A protein has these predicted regions:
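Active-site/acyl-donor-binding loops of N-acyltransferases
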Residues: 2-13, 75-79, 147, 151-183, ...
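Acyl-donor binding region in acyl/amide transferases
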Residues: 78-161, 274-333
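A conserved beta-strand-loop-helix scaffold within acyl/acetyltransferase catalytic domains
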Residues: 6-91, 143-290
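Short C-terminal domain-edge/linker segments immediately following a structured domain
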Residues: 91, 99-107, 171-174, 198-204, ...
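Glycine-rich loops and low-complexity Gly/Arg-rich segments
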Residues: 95-99, 164-169, 194-197, 231-234, ...
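Short, flexible segments with low predicted structural confidence
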Residues: 217-218, 295-296, 352
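A broadly tuned preference for mixed-charge, low-complexity surface segments
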Residues: 107-122, 186-206, 257, 265-269, ...
């Protein structure tokens, strides 16, 4: 069953219609999504996720004239990724005291609704906030909005507060690894980058490129060994329930480092999508590898893979701020807009503390770069 609304937002705007659906399967076919995190396959993967405790799932189909959009919303009671952000920020108590409605998933590196007009965004917020109230959540959180879209969301509906949860990292690939390294802030960083790759080669590391069922065979290793390089903690952010269906997202590929005996040393779970190679998460077998620079070796191999597959952008994802700053990657602030379901100054205060703490966390990392 679906519920449709039709409203005319201004004398000069087109009518926007929207309908709720419990699954993406019943929705009309979509145009090619802007990122892998906006695909139907990504949304479908969250239909059975348990690592993030999702209590209900709601997919909003929006029609604006001939343009169609979909935005997925998730009622979450416990998110390991959100708790990791609280840990990084050093806050002393949980931000939320009840369920939250995220739109879309917090785990997608980029959120928002790329390509949508302001009336469509306004409809998404209005329907999302009404749903958030109806199901008893504290807030609607529109997650991980890149700078190019932030103004549009704020113009559509001013949020009660905003939080930059993390920064993505992007770099132009160029025609070769040498061209990529030439853009590093210092020559010494380039020498170290090459040296660490040679050390991995000398130790017998080889690259395995895994897709589909071959990648699915390694999801348990990504679930248990996922890391955020440079962090003093590594909460269990990912589970096989999450990772296995993500192998079916367009462009999903594992860049795996293997020892000479064929055993797993580490890997990047990636998406080669559009013009970019997205490095979504990393897994490193730290217990066996000691001081072997697996992460840097994989980063070098990722650049090679991006060059070989014609990617123009390397999107190195979130976290690992000091390391990525040393490589001269462009940081991109990802803002999450929070719309409260009722006035709650204490929640706004806690969100402000989270924002400040995360900003300080990133600045400390950059100062170490």
């Amino acid at each position: 069953m679906s519920v449709t609304t039709l409203r005319r937002l201004s004398p000069h705007s087109s009518a926007v219609t929207s309908t709720w659906h419990s699954s993406v399967v019943a929705l009309p076919a979509e145009r090619r999504a802007a990122t892998p995190f906006h695909t139907r396959e990504w949304a479908a993967a969250w239909q059975a996720v348990r690592t993030e405790q999702v209590r209900s799932r709601h997919h909003l189909f929006l029609q604006d004239g001939s343009s169609q959009h979909r935005m997925s919303f998730y009622q979450v009671s416990n998110s390991p990724l959100w708790h990791a952000m609280e840990d990084d920020a050093g806050v002393t108590r949980p931000t939320f005291e009840a369920d939250v409605l995220y739109g879309p998933s917090l785990y997608g590196e980029y959120g928002g609704l790329p390509g949508a007009t302001v009336p469509v965004l306004a409809e998404a917020v209005d329907r999302g906030r009404a749903l958030a109230r109806d199901i008893g959540t504290e807030a609607l959180v529109i997650t991980n909005i890149p700078p190019v879209e932030r103004t549009l969301w704020c113009q559509a509906r001013t949020p009660d507060t905003e939080v930059v949860l993390y920064w993505a990292h992007r770099a132009r690939v160029g025609a070769s690894v040498d061209e990529f390294i030439a853009n590093f802030p210092s020559a010494s960083t380039g020498r170290e980058f090459r040296s660490q790759h040679r050390r991995g080669n000398d130790a017998g590391l080889t690259l395995k490129i895994a897709r589909g069922s071959e990648l699915q065979a390694h999801v348990a290793e990504f679930g248990t060994q996922s890391v955020r390089v440079g962090d003093g903690h590594s909460p269990a952010l990912y589970g096989t329930d999450m990772l296995a269906p993500l192998t079916r997202v367009p462009g999903a590929v594992g860049l795996l480092a293997e020892h000479s005996d064929g055993s797993f040393a580490g890997g990047f779970f990636c998406f080669r999508y559009g013009s970019a190679l997205y490095l979504w998460t990393a897994a490193i077998d730290g217990a066996r590898n000691g001081d072997l620079p697996i992460y840097s070796w994989l980063m070098y191999e990722s650049v090679k893979f991006a060059v070989d597959t014609g990617a123009s952008v390397l999107d190195a994802g979130r976290f690992d701020y000091a390391y990525k700053a040393r490589l001269g990657m462009l940081p991109v602030a990802l803002m999450s807009a929070v719309y409260l379901t009722r006035p709650n100054p204490h929640l706004v205060s806690r969100l402000g503390a989270l924002h400040t703490g995360l900003n300080q966390h990133v600045l400390r990392a950059w100062n170490k770069a």
